[in-house]
């Protein structure tokens, strides 16, 4: 026994009647803004990482200080 197209249609109609089209569209807009800000945050995190120094450079710096 699987879910048919009529059962899905009835559920969609009930959701639209309960929440209204305006509420659903504003909710989807908020979800889209959240996804965009998440992607933007992930992109800036990747580009903000400093380049690692070579180990030999770190050893030379410590030897010069001694």
UniProtKB/Swiss-Prot annotation:
InterPro entries: TatA/B/E (IPR003369), TatA/E (IPR006312). Residues 43-66 are annotated as: Disordered. GO terms for biological process: protein transport by the Tat complex. The chain crosses the membrane at residues 1-21. It is found in: Cell inner membrane. Pfam families: TatA_B_E. Signal peptide: none annotated. It is a single-pass membrane protein. The keyword Transmembrane applies. Disulfide bonds: none annotated. Its main location: membrane. GO terms for cellular component: TAT protein transport complex. Residues 50-66 have a biased composition (Basic and acidic residues). GO terms for molecular function: protein transmembrane transporter activity. Keywords: Cell inner membrane, Cell membrane, Membrane, Protein transport, Translocation, Transmembrane, Transmembrane helix, Transport. Belongs to the TatA/E family. Part of the twin-arginine translocation (Tat) system that transports large folded proteins containing a characteristic twin-arginine motif in their signal peptide across membranes. TatA could form the protein-conducting channel of the Tat system. PANTHER family: SEC-INDEPENDENT PROTEIN TRANSLOCASE PROTEIN TATA. The Tat system comprises two distinct complexes: a TatABC complex, containing multiple copies of TatA, TatB and TatC subunits, and a separate TatA complex, containing only TatA subunits. Substrates initially bind to the TatABC complex, which probably triggers association of the separate TatA complex to form the active translocon. This is Sec-independent protein translocase protein TatA. The lineage of its organism: Bacteria, Pseudomonadati, Pseudomonadota, Alphaproteobacteria, Candidatus Pelagibacterales.
